[in-house]
Every structure is written in structure tokens, then in C-alpha cells.
Amino acid sequence: MFSFFRRKKKQETPALEEAQVQETAAKVESEVAQIVGNIKEDVESLAESVKGRAESAVETVSGAVEQVKETVAEMPSEAGEAAERVESAKEAVAETVGEAVGQVQEAVATTEEHKLGWAARLKQGLAKSRDKMAKSLAGVFGGGQIGEDLYEELETVLITGDMGMEATEYLMKDVRGRVSLKGLKDGNELRGALKEALYDLIKPLEKPLVLPETKEPFVIMLAGINGAGKTTSIGKLAKYFQAQGKSVLLAAGDTFRAAAREQLQAWGGRNNVTVISQTTGDSAAVCFDAVQAAKARIDIVLADTAGRLPTQLHLMEEIKKVKRVLQKAIPGAPHEIIVVLDANIGQNAVNQVKAFDDALGLTGLIVTKLDGTAKGGILAALASDRPVPVRYIGVGEGIDDLRPFDARAFVDRLLD
């Protein structure tokens, strides 16, 4: 950066010019010191999550400052050239400082984004579903008098919102009852009635996972079709349980999909969690080894399995085998059997839940990718047709974007 500084043969200079050089050099050192001091103060105030990047910025600035100091000490005594070179040095330092400050500001912005509360991220994640429903409901809640035409419009919106026929019929009956009971008159009041009806429908799905106090590992087996987000959900769950003070071990039981093991190992490395895997062998063997390794030292085992369609009968038999092997490893295991659902598939999610529930006896669901779909009504369809508890929902790609399902928060963000 400062390659333009070169030593020159010393020449005699009048005393006045020599004093100007020294004064200029001292001024540069003072300004540089002030710049560095300001940067260090900014860096020290950063959150822990940007500490590394901030320290890198300080090192960059400090290196530049040292070069300036060395150059000042070796400056030629020729006043004119000295002043010119000092100005160039100041510009170079200012540029370096500007770049460093930019890095710090970018890091701070990233930190602030991750500090968004869950309610804000949930609202942001449900934007597509909410926007679609809001446009469709604009005519319904526009202030017109409640009548059969309005009811027909509302029914159409609910069906096209992937709530399914059974859930739609339930909601329409419930809304009509509330309108009659409370004497509601217009579309604006109808919104509140719909929100309460939808909340009552999906509230039974809100059953947070409670971990028992036991000496044996709590085993959670995850299943689902390819692409639903099982492996990613396992990585996020590991982080979630660690935040609760639990020790976690991962079983790379997806022995079919290319790079599935490597993907889970990457999540394990990210969370500092051990991953049990095999280069050969079947899913059941991997899961069994993981449970054996976890005994007496690990709180939770998260067992990944290969993606499969419910219509692939031989693969459904294989996942039943995984369950049986886990039962042999620890009586009562797996303690939780969760299917991971991609919200983008809409009504097909109900069929998947039915098939996996019939085969395995599901205890919970994880609904992912709600941020990428306009089909947020799928939870109403599940609540009406096969009400397996929704343990967690995912509304983003961040590691903290998987949280326990909250029915009230979901309805409020969907229909606000």
C-alpha cells in the first residue's frame, strides 16, 4: 500500500524546512492515532458474533499505521517532497480505515438482522401466505354487510388457501355461529371471527416437546420424503437443544442419498456435535451404533433416515426396521417419531402424514419452508384431517428459524 515511500539519499535542508517536516510528521501520527482510537472503540462495542471480523479490521488498520510510522521515521528531509508524501500517506490510511469501518458496519448490520425477534421472523416468513390471503380477503373484509355472498367469497378463499374441504366446512360453520351469537354486522367484524375460529381449530396442534429427566438418551427419529428438509432440521434442532443445556449426538442414518452423511457432519461441526456414521451398512445399524455411543453420556440422539415416498413399500418396511432396532437398543425408543413436511406441497402433506402415521405411529411434525410458500393454510387441513402435534415450524434458512409451534402467534401473523 505504501510502496511509493522509498529511501532517498539525505540532503541538507534549511532549519525551517526541517521543522515543517517534523511538524507534518507529528500531525500525521496524531491523526492516525485518533483514527485508530475511534476504530478500536467501535470494534470493542461490537457483539460477540462479529468479534472475529472486527478484530480483522483492527489488524488491517494497525498494520497500515505501523507502516506510516516507519515511513515517517525514515522520511527525507526535503520539505516539499516530505509534505507531498505525507499527504499521500494520510489518504492511503484514510482509505484503509474506510474499508475497515465498512467491514465493521457490515458485521453490525448482520448481527442486528439476526437479533430480530421470533415474532418478527415469523411474520416475515409467513409473508407469502399472508399476502395471498390478504388480497383474497380484501373483498370479504372490505366493510360490506355480512350475507350469503360474503360467506361464499370467504369459503372460496379458504379452499384456495389450501385449508382443505373438511377444515373449510368446520371454519365456515364456526364463523357463522360466531356471527349469529355476537350479532356481527359487516366484513370488518368478520375478520375477528375468522381468526378465533382458525385459532380454535389449530390450537390442539400446539403441543411442545417436553424432554423427561432420565439417565437414558432421549431418542428422536426423523422421517419424510426427499427434499423436505430433514437433515437441515436436525442441524437446527441440535442447536436448539444445545441452547437448553442439553448434550446432543447425531446419527447419519440416511445411507442412500449422496452427500447426506457429509451434510450432517457439516452441521455437527457447526454445532460442535458428534456425528455417528458409517461408509457402509444400513440405516438401522447406524442408528443402533449412535444410541450405544450415547448411553450414559448424551441427553438427546437425533436420528436421520433416508427420504422415501409412502408409496415405496420396501422403503417403508425398512424404516419400520429402524424403529424396531432402536427399540432393542433402548426400551421405549424411539421416544419421538417426527415427520418433516415441506409446506410447499400443500394438500399432499395430509396424505404423507397419514401414510407415515399408519406405518410408524407419529408423535410429532416439523413443518418447514413456510417462508417459501403461499400455502400456510395447510396446518388447518392437518388439524382437521390428521391432528398430529406440530412440534416445530421453520420460516427461514437461519439456524434459529426453527421454533416450537405457537398457534396464536401463527394465526395473528397469518391474518393480520
Curated annotation (Swiss-Prot):
The protein's name: Signal recognition particle receptor FtsY
One example of a Gene Ontology biological process annotation: SRP-dependent cotranslational protein targeting to membrane
Q: What would be the name of the gene that encodes this protein?
A: ftsY
Question: How is the quaternary structure described?
Answer: Part of the signal recognition particle protein translocation system, which is composed of SRP and FtsY. SRP is a ribonucleoprotein composed of Ffh and a 4.5S RNA molecule.
Please give one Gene Ontology molecular function term for this protein.
signal recognition particle binding
Instruction: Give the subcellular location.
Output: Cell membrane; Cytoplasm
**What is the protein's major site of localization?**
membrane
Do you know which SMART domains this protein is assigned to? AAA, SRP54, SRP54_N
PROSITE patterns according to UniProt: SRP54
Its family?
Answer: Belongs to the GTP-binding SRP family. FtsY subfamily.
What cofactor does this one take? Mg(2+)
What catalytic reaction does the record list?
GTP + H2O = GDP + phosphate + H(+)
- GO CC: one term? cytoplasm
